[in-house]
Amino acid sequence: MRQVCCSALPPPPLEKGRCSSYSDSSSSSSERSSSSSSSSSESGSSSRSSSNNSSISRPAAPPEPRPQQQPQPRSPAARRAAARSRAAAAGGMRRDPAPGFSMLLFGVSLACYSPSLKSVQDQAYKAPVVVEGKVQGLVPAGGSSSNSTREPPASGRVALVKVLDKWPLRSGGLQREQVISVGSCVPLERNQRYIFFLEPTEQPLVFKTAFAPLDTNGKNLKKEVGKILCTDCATRPKLKKMKSQTGQVGEKQSLKCEAAAGNPQPSYRWFKDGKELNRSRDIRIKYGNGRKNSRLQFNKVKVEDAGEYVCEAENILGKDTVRGRLYVNSVSTTLSSWSGHARKCNETAKSYCVNGGVCYYIEGINQLSCKCPNGFFGQRCLEKLPLRLYMPDPKQKAEELYQKRVLTITGICVALLVVGIVCVVAYCKTKKQRKQMHNHLRQNMCPAHQNRSLANGPSHPRLDPEEIQMADYISKNVPATDHVIRRETETTFSGSHSCSPSHHCSTATPTSSHRHESHTWSLERSESLTSDSQSGIMLSSVGTSKCNSPACVEARARRAAAYNLEERRRATAPPYHDSVDSLRDSPHSERYVSALTTPARLSPVDFHYSLATQVPTFEITSPNSAHAVSLPPAAPISYRLAEQQPLLRHPAPPGPGPGPGPGPGPGADMQRSYDSYYYPAAGPGPRRGTCALGGSLGSLPASPFRIPEDDEYETTQECAPPPPPRPRARGASRRTSAGPRRWRRSRLNGLAAQRARAARDSLSLSSGSGGGSASASDDDADDADGALAAESTPFLGLRGAHDALRSDSPPLCPAADSRTYYSLDSHSTRASSRHSRGPPPRAKQDSAPL
């Protein structure tokens, strides 16, 4: 149906007879014109009839409601009045202020008859001017602008459009923000945006619509238009080469036609044997990738589908074609032997077989036969086979599923096994490292071998030798009442006296506020504590270890022999007097050395730490700092030049001693034999001014962790009394006799042998008694000389030094009982007064062998 957009004004003379399809505006304008002309006409009925006569509807226009027609006047006057009214109406059209408006409406009417294209791109490409604009207002037929927003959309009017966007290829010389007049035959809404496909007119800024405007709301029209209106975007289609396909009867096959280029998007058509193919039950035409390709698909290909196919692509710029073939192979069947004489049926007999069966004509018998597809059988493939005959075997699917499950479970098990192996390896490695760490710590805590034990000393940390208390250790030969428990006492040192060559040097001895209640080691017996501790470190606790080697057994036998010899001598000896090793808790005793060298777990010693805080201590360190031994410091050292030579015996000053010496007798013979060993040139007996050797008979080598040059030695001197006896007072004789009994010894580097200790004891006993068995004393002296000669080899040079000092040096020690300790002068007086009171009760030494 065609639609004509007409103006509200009367048409020009050439267009007389055209009418408007919109009668509401024309009728209203006719009524206004008739009412205006009724003032000059004869009657209103004649004017209405004239206006009605001017409104003639075409058959193509939709039916419009028309007013009831009045009967025409038959009189000539009425006819003349009607003619005048028509002339007045014609004169109103000629007075239109817009003379080009009729041209615009004529163009709009032509635009409405233009055929619509399928693609928006086609419309944009064919339209001379394409802009995006916004409707600002609608101009009614009277020429006044419509400002009412509630007015319904008007059609057949001129719209005032503001240009918002344009495309360079189709701009038509327009600029943005420019207002143009557009005549449209479709309803337009005010303040709405449209894409206008326009054609220019004779009037500037006046356009007519080539295609219906498109609303841009909710559509991607601008993008589609931009794809075709860009520079060098529009191209004719160009198709790719089509691939030929080969398939079996009943299979699904397809032919693909794809465009390599083409803008706007081309449309596709398929042809076979010059005939266009359309969609059917067996053939489908599909498009893909935004209609860039087309696919001709056969659901079940047949033998008759084989042939040549043509694909044609076309757009507004041109078209292109491509060709391809489809080959269909018949499936081999179990026909009889005469199948070699069969041929395909003609086109007229192909419909003999149904359900996709292929028809064959068997020559000789002139009979048609069908090759049925899977699932059908019979003469014409009418019967359908059971589903189980042509469907896949469910057992096969179950077998495949089972295999997949087995593979999955196997993979999981292998993964778990690998994880377990990794965990076990990590655990074993960690355990090995932990074991190595424990072994290392155990080696650091416990001695690994004998040398380390000797070097590191006791296993208890930071032990002060002064704090060793001999508790729970009962000697075999000493009664329980004779054991002494060491108590903590306050010890003071007095070092106010200075040393000089003519003055006797002595060292301060510790004094106790309760001397009658506690028995402590005097400094004269304990000042060589550091040396004994260092030598004790080198001694191993052989008594507590297992003895399996021959050397160990031999050493134990020797110690047992020495022990028996000492026991026999002690049994025949007179009452005990003080000697070097007489005190049970002396640093020179076997118990003390054994306590230092025995591990803490086997030692019968209780350790107490009561060292005064004001007395600094020092440590004997070893490579293993955990076994360092802390020792108390020595007293301040002040000694003479002559005392710097360690373990050298100096002759006593010539002249009478303070008391009578040992008279002729067995004791004197033993003394002479003792002195004759060390001083062969001195004569048969000890001369005046000679010094007895005392208790220092030799020492073991120094500890490998102690530098002997750093030790501060102290010399012990014992001056033998003059041979001629003199009558003295009782107290003086006691003081004099106490002299040879109190052997002086230096700081030892090792432990004296048993035989040397026995010799010293026997000498002390014989000299204290004054008259004993001469034969026994001589034998003991000979044994002692042998022992001394065996253990004094490190000091063979003592004789020369003694002779030189005896001949050239002045007397360095008095005849009285004195010891050259470094800074105490009150020691000799205290010692003499103590000995004058009488010998203390003898405390037997430990009879157990080392």
Curated annotation (Swiss-Prot):
GO terms for cellular component: extracellular region; extracellular space; plasma membrane. SMART domains: IG (SM00409), IGc2 (SM00408). One of its GO terms (biological process) is nervous system development. Residues 20-59, 75-92, 494-506, 750-767 have a biased composition (Low complexity). The chain crosses the membrane at residues 406-426. GO terms for molecular function: growth factor activity; signaling receptor binding. Residues 237-332 form the Ig-like C2-type domain. Proteolytic cleavage close to the plasma membrane on the external face leads to the release of the soluble growth factor form. Residues 341-382 form the EGF-like domain. Glycans are attached at residues 52-53, 147, 278, 346. Pfam families: I-set, Neuregulin. Direct ligand for ERBB3 and ERBB4 tyrosine kinase receptors. Concomitantly recruits ERBB1 and ERBB2 coreceptors, resulting in ligand-stimulated tyrosine phosphorylation and activation of the ERBB receptors. May also promote the heterodimerization with the EGF receptor. The cytoplasmic domain may be involved in the regulation of trafficking and proteolytic processing. Regulation of the proteolytic processing involves initial intracellular domain dimerization. Belongs to the neuregulin family. This is Pro-neuregulin-2, membrane-bound isoform. It comes from Homo sapiens (Human).
